[in-house]
Amino acid sequence: MFSSLYPLARASLFKMDAEDAHHLTLRALGAAGRTGLACALSARVPDAPRTVMGLTFRNPVGLAAGLDKDGAAIDGLAALGFGFIEVGTVTPRAQPGNPRPRMFRLPQAEALINRMGFNNHGVDQFVKNVQAARYRGILGLNIGKNADTPIERAAEDYLYCLERVYPFASYVTINISSPNTKNLRQLQGAGELDALLAALKDKQQRLADLHGKLVPLALKIAPDLDDEQVKEIGDTLLRHKIEAVIATNTTLSRAAVQGLPHADEAGGLSGRPVFDASNEVIRKLHAEVGSEVPIIGVGGIFSGEDARAKLAAGAALVQLYTGFIYRGPALVSECVKAIARERTA
């Protein structure tokens, strides 16, 4: 039902400020989940099970982190047919993020630019929201560092968040690739990444012993990487036996949107313009890690064929964000069906 109404809703939402529309949609989804009205949103999406990271996904099409930073609308989002949901990024302490305006639509390019800056209510409230959700599917919890934490002490924030979210996560994503937190992408450097992942894997094992379950770790990386950086990241993932990698986050490049309104705004660009760059990173990374580190492909998916292209590049699963905002819940079903056809062809 909601899928058929979404084009009308989008026309109204796109007349609003981008961030105001975002908050309004999240509030509506959150209310639907809390009141049981989520059944009215329920989408008919076929099952297409896939096992990755030792987890069985209802289908391989997930929601990327960033849409629901505080985990406040999990049940409403779950009704839309996603095979898994990822919420966050959350930081140890609440923080407001960057000054507004900080989210911009580029409709001519079917793109968004954001410089949100990990705005969230902090990990304690995040955990309460996750615990309150009735959803029992695969749930990824995405963690980051506070803006005022020195980059040299970033590991402390990640370790703290990992400990807090671990009991409630199907998997935990380590976000080191947002361009909107100063110096964060430095953690993708070989030495910095090696030290961070070593600390996180040690913590993961101790938490697994404590809770009696091993929660997989996924690393989220940027598309703005050269071949040597991709190789170094691949080697580090293999060395530390990280369970998955999410490729990719938003790009700093503006090559595909030059001259468009808002194109010069600072922040990360997502949507169609990042599709090819994301796929290229997926291909190169897959050549390095093979099947040992599953890749979750995200970036510029607007059709079932786009989702299939991610898998052809080497991804095991895909996630939607900007395409979902532009096309609505119908995109979820379209992607699942396209992938299912590919597997039975």
From Swiss-Prot:
Cofactor section: FMN
HAMAP family associated with the record: DHO_dh_type2
Primary location recorded for the protein, binned into one broad class: membrane
GO molecular function, one term: dihydroorotate dehydrogenase (quinone) activity
Family: Belongs to the dihydroorotate dehydrogenase family. Type 2 subfamily.
Documented EC number(s): 1.3.5.2
Protein keywords: Cell membrane, Flavoprotein, FMN, Membrane, Oxidoreductase, Pyrimidine biosynthesis
Protein function: Catalyzes the conversion of dihydroorotate to orotate with quinone as electron acceptor.
One GO CC term on file: cytoplasm
Protein name: Dihydroorotate dehydrogenase (quinone)
